[in-house]
């Protein structure tokens, strides 16, 4: 890597760490100063990332060796390819505006210093994943992301539901990370390197072992909340809404998709097929479940799960370029939707039930305009940001597998249905509660990010697709996208138009009665099936009926063998026997005797090993 680029990446990576340390040491009680310091650093990083994105194309590397174990080298370095540059810009740009939104949203919070310090350490962690050039470095930053997200979700730790949600997210992610670390060990044992470039150059004749890809895929399943480890994401909405926008829309959950795109060459056809089927199924299921949520943030959480499934399906179809493109577009409009939800919650005095809202379009016009624009992009309205990437994935699925295309088509329809429901219940019709009746527009620090991300990038990012698509993938993606713009008979376009038409009908359907969920009233059984948390119930049964009994049995063995045989019999019996044979007790309470015993024992062990 050229010196100017290496120094640029150093600044991008370590500026947020410096901000976090400074806040932790000096600004914990100076919340306003901490907020603006963290926000200023975030905008500086975004400017540097933009400079990097617009620099000369090509893959650049920088690496320093930290340790050498035999033939194995462990180091710290950067791999800056087109995907990494794009991700650096998207993460830092979206995060900068979320920081500004947080200045207004968290204005009255007594723990602002801790909150913004957590945002900065999270930025450091996620940017480390983006630039890492090896699996071990990726894993270190991966765990830092888990730690910082735990802190941010538990910001309201005095509330039981927030504390429980943070623990749930942390534990469920550790399950996926177990597979990740086993994959790292497997890779090290078989190939002797963890460096992405060196692994890419190996290309074994017999193909990559399927187990390697399957183990590394576990990290993606946990971090990107895919089935069956998706249960933590909706509970994570217990954190402040800007956290939901940053971690659970734009960065953390997308990190798993980015990681899979980074290691796509390690995935065998069997693993790719599993990723595709799992992703498409998750997209359809999560989209339907969003129809049965009354909490605005949880509805958006299921929407995020659906889009992550679409990205996973793109990876499985062998199109990581499309997955990365959709990840970028999704970050813009989904961050806008979460920030819009935060503005609504702030304006409605912390009310989150959509059935208790309504009529906010008149009282919150800027929020409404940005939210509707992002919603249209979420629904893949032609020529908006979401359309360019989502329809390209649908087209790739149609060309590859009809079953996957059907599942993704169902997800597209569900997206339009829950989006129409959300907009209708929140912004139109009469006010359904006193909180909605007295709602007010948010301050400029909260509306400015909505205008930029919602009315700006959620709408216009699609027109800049050529600039956002990684250069190496331009020929594979840009031309089909241009062609689709003028071919209304493509399967993806037809599905998209049908979904939009059904969304328009849903908008009328949900406006029949104020403050009432029409689907629950007309189809209570179907609504109940979608609303019921099946996997949480299954995990609860497993922990209570299976795992608890296993741990009780292990505790019995520990009491019998470890505490009984090893500690009591050996620990107490051996000194007693030696004391009986020597005629004196070994425990006399004199420090010099213990020191003498330690020295003699050490000398005997040294003599034994040297004499072998």
Protein language model regions, located:
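N-terminal signal-anchor/start-transfer transmembrane helix
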Residues: 13-28, 96, 221, 283
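Aromatic-capped, Gly/Pro-kinked transmembrane alpha-helices
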Residues: 470-488, 512-612
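Hydrophobic transmembrane alpha-helices and their helix-loop junctions in integral membrane proteins
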Residues: 83, 94-138, 147-441, 445, ...
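Hydrophobic alpha-helical membrane-insertion segments
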Residues: 40-54, 176-185, 374-378, 449-464, ...
């Amino acid at each position: 890597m050229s010196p100017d680029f290496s120094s640029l990446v150093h600044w991008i990576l370590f500026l947020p760490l410096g901000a976090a340390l400074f806040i932790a040491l000096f600004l914990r009680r100076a919340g306003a100063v901490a907020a603006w310091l963290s926000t200023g650093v975030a905008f500086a990083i975004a400017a540097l990332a933009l400079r990097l994105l617009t620099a000369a194309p090509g893959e650049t590397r920088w690496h320093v060796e930290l340790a050498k174990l035999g033939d194995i080298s462990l180091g710290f370095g950067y791999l800056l390819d087109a995907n990494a540059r794009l991700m650096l810009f998207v993460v830092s740009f979206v995060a900068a505006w979320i920081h500004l939104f947080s200045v207004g949203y968290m204005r009255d919070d007594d723990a602002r210093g801790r909150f913004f310090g957590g945002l900065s350490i999270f930025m450091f962690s996620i940017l480390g994943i983006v630039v890492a050039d090896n699996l071990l470095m990726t894993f270190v930053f991966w765990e830092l992301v888990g730690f910082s997200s735990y802190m941010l979700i538990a910001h309201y730790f005095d509330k039981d539901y927030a504390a429980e949600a943070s623990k749930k997210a942390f534990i469920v992610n550790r399950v996926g990370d177990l597979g990740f670390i086993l994959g790292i060990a497997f890779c090290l044992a078989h190939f002797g390197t963890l460096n992405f470039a060196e692994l890419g150059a190996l290309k074994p004749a017999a193909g990559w072992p399927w187990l390697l890809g399957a183990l590394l895929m576990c990290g993606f399943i946990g971090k990107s909340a895919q089935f069956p480890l998706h249960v933590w994401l909706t509970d994570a909405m217990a954190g402040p809404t800007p956290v939901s926008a940053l971690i659970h829309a734009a960065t953390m959950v997308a990190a798993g998709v980015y990681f899979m795109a980074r290691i796509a060459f390690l995935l065998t056809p069997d693993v790719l097929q599993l990723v595709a089927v799992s992703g498409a199924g998750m997209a359809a299921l999560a989209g339907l479940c969003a129809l049965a949520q009354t909490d605005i943030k949880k509805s958006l959480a299921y929407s995020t799960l659906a889009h992550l499934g679409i990205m996973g399906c793109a990876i499985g179809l062998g199109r990581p370029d499309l997955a990365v493109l959709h990840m970028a577009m999704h970050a813009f409009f989904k961050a806008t939707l979460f920030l819009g939800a935060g503005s609504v919650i702030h304006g409605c005095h912390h009310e989150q039930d959509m059935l208790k809202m309504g009529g906010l379009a008149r009282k919150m016009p800027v929020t409404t305009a940005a939210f509707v624009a992002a919603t249209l992009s979420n629904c893949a309205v032609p020529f908006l940001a979401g359309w360019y990437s989502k329809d390209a994935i649908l087209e790739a699925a149609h060309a590859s597998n009809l079953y996957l295309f059907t599942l993704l088509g169902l997800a597209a329809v569900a997206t339009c249905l829950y989006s129409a429901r959300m907009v209708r219940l929140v912004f139109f019709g009469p006010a359904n509660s006193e909180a909605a009746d007295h709602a007010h527009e948010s301050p400029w620090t909260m509306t400015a990010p909505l205008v930029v991300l919602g009315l700006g990038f959620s709408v216009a990012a699609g027109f800049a697709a050529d600039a956002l698509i990684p250069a190496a993938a331009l020929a594979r993606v840009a031309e089909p996208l241009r062609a689709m713009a003028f071919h209304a008979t493509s399967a993806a376009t037809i599905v998209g138009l049908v979904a939009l038409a059904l969304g328009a009908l849903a908008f009328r359907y949900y406006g029949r009665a104020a403050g009432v969920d029409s689907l629950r009233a007309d189809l209570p059984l179907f609504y109940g099936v979608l609303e019921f948390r099946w996997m949480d119930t299954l995990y609860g049964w497993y922990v209570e009926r299976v795992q608890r009994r296993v741990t009780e049995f292990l505790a019995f063995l520990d009491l019998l063998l470890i505490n009984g045989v090893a500690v009591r019999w050996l620990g107490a019996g051996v000194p007693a026997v030696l004391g009986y044979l020597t005629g004196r007790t070994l425990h006399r309470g004199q420090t010099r005797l213990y020191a003498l015993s330690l020295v003699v024992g050490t000398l005997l062990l040294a003599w034994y090993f040297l004499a072998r």
